[in-house]
């Protein structure tokens, strides 16, 4: 198994998950000075939605989801919207509808509240997921109202045969809210049969970690990017114990993940394991070793 950062999107307001039978209206705040913004809508290919988009000034348009060529352009107020209609792929059963918003006039797209209305035409599951660009791709004021923190882990941490690492606050022994959330065994997401698949696998310290800087000193850093190297080092120690010292010559790959899961310890405030926040718990190499 390879080690993967889970990303720090848990509190970023960049994801909304809903069911069209009860969450057909989604509001998106667009901050000032956004030069462009893209929105991904993922849904079950069997579902057919009628989609309407309303600009901050009240002008609205219906998005055609059945058009030859799979792409077209429309304008709302001072914003040009490029619409791309995706299809299922050899490696994915879900459908993506991709909206790329750019200025039609001036340098910025319209700031304010954009509203996406989804109306069912043919409903099989009714599930849908909306995503904005991750990290620094958008301003701090841009995000969904009533955002969904679940399923905010990012590629490549979504792959099955990697060890996905989140972050926790080692001072308070609690989950770090910026750490992206995944899914547990009992959940299912569009295009992902998550039975038996848990993300993240575990968490490691990721708040105010002392790391070397370019000046030859140390500085406090925060993020899943600093939790993952801790688990990488722990994996190296585990494989040294198993392979180099002769305790287990086959201690690599998914077996390392299994040992980490077995040794993970509980965190304050988490009552059920595994879960979509901390997986099996916090890293503990000592508990992962066989007696």
Protein language model features and the residues they cover:
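Beta-sandwich interaction modules
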Residues: 80-114, 121, 130-133
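Extended low-complexity, serine/threonine- and proline-enriched intrinsically disordered segments
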Residues: 47-81, 130-135
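Catalytic-core environment of secreted peptidases
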Residues: 57-65, 167-229, 287
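Short, small-residue-biased leader/transition segments that mark boundaries at the very start
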Residues: 3-5
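Subtilisin-like serine protease catalytic core
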Residues: 34-37, 44-47, 158-161, 172-174, ...
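C-terminal edge strands of extracellular/lumenal beta-sandwich accessory domains
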Residues: 122-167
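Hydrophobic beta-strand segments within beta-rich accessory/binding domains
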Residues: 24-45, 49-53, 105, 111-120, ...
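Hydrolase catalytic cores
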Residues: 38-39, 47-50, 54-56, 206-273
